[in-house]
Regions:
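Extended, highly charged segments
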Residues: 1-340
Length: 340
């Protein structure tokens, strides 16, 4: 899915407007890798889901109730101790990372004002939820990462929180059309436009890189060698248009439907698939994420039920066939009973 850093930038803007000043009333952990905050405020969504599930990491408003375990997990109890009654001061995105920081004003054990930060790292299989104190020290994390798991970055109680290691890429917000055109002219000719964009700029997903190539040259797989000068200009222009839209908050989130099943989503309308996918545009990203994963989960549940029913039917069919074969054999043996 396309929960890239640019999508997270739009989500951050949206959550900032909705959550700043909201009070955290309750905290639940319905799943091993999901936290639900009950938040109260003028624009707050009521319940906020923070998921570190590797396949569907996200932060969004939540419709309906989730079934909670009879006994709250230890991490949930820790969050309740530190964050219940706190007010969300600020929602931020460090750099252009797939990370959201929720800065929360709370009262400490002595009744004095303090600051805690709840961090949602939305990075696929590296997704995590981390609680920090006002000195940037990790209080605890949903997934503890020790040196045996990662030599580059550990996430453990008592350690100072560090951002994930930087990639050797450029910020898309620092370069204009002329700069992008000049870099493109000096790029390796045997690379595709998609790969060059992906390797050059930080925070851009493969879907968006292909979209830029398609808008510029009508081909998602076109190589740099095959570009005319005018097409190079268009690649630079389309890249600048998308980067500028993100910087200025010009998001137009949409879901791509394959029939009635959500296939992908983006922060800008996607044109590269033509009429193959149906496009549904949303007003806000939180609703998009909620619908995308709710619909997919429901369809996955239905497919699982269908598979379970088919397995039961096939098992019963095979059992009946075996019984029928035994009865046929008994009948054949019975025909010779007079001779015996």
């Amino acid at each position: 899915m396309s929960l890239d850093a640019m999508f997270v930038a739009g989500l951050k803007d949206e959550l900032s407007r909705a959550l700043e000043g909201a009070r955290i009333d309750k905290i639940h952990q319905p799943e091993r890798d999901e936290i639900v905050l009950a938040v109260r405020g003028a624009k707050a969504p009521g319940r906020l889901l923070i998921s570190a599930n590797p396949g569907k990491a996200r932060v969004c408003g939540l419709d309906g109730m989730r079934e909670n375990p009879p006994n709250a997990p230890m991490f949930c109890m820790l969050l309740r101790k530190h964050l219940t009654g706190g007010r969300i001061r600020r929602v931020s995105q460090p750099g252009l990372e797939r990370i959201l920081d929720f800065e929360i004003d709370v009262m400490d054990e002595l009744g004095l004002p303090a600051k805690k930060t709840l961090t949602a790292e939305l990075m696929g299989r590296h997704s995590n939820i981390i609680l920090r104190d006002g000195k940037n020290m990790i209080i605890d994390a949903l997934k503890r990462i020790d040196i045996a798991m990662s030599e580059k970055r550990q996430v453990l109680p008592g350690l100072i929180y560090d951002l994930p290691p930087k990639q050797n890429k450029l910020s898309p917000f620092d370069y204009k059309r002329a700069d992008i055109f000049e870099m493109l002219c000096g790029a390796k000719k045997d690379e595709s436009v998609e790969k060059w964009l992906l390797d050059t700029f930080f925070g851009v997903s493969p879907l968006i890189c292909r979209e830029i190539a398609y808008r510029a040259a009508g081909d998602t797989t076109i190589g740099i060698r095959g570009l005319s000068d005018s097409e190079r200009e268009r690649v630079a222009a389309e890249a600048e248009n998308i980067f500028t839209a993100v910087k200025s908050g010009g998001f137009k989130p949409c879901i791509l439907y394959d029939g009635d099943k959500p296939a992908d989503f983006s922060f800008v309308p996607i044109t590269q698939y033509g009429g193959l996918y149906r496009l549904k545009v949303y007003e806000d990203m939180s609703c998009l994420l909620r619908d995308f994963y709710d619909i997919r989960d429901e369809k996955d549940r239905l497919q699982k039920k269908a598979r379970d029913v088919m397995k039961t039917v096939n098992t019963a069919y095979e059992r009946a066939n075996r019984k029928l074969e035994l009865q046929r054999q008994e009948l054949a043996d019975a025909r010779n009973r007079e001779e015996i």
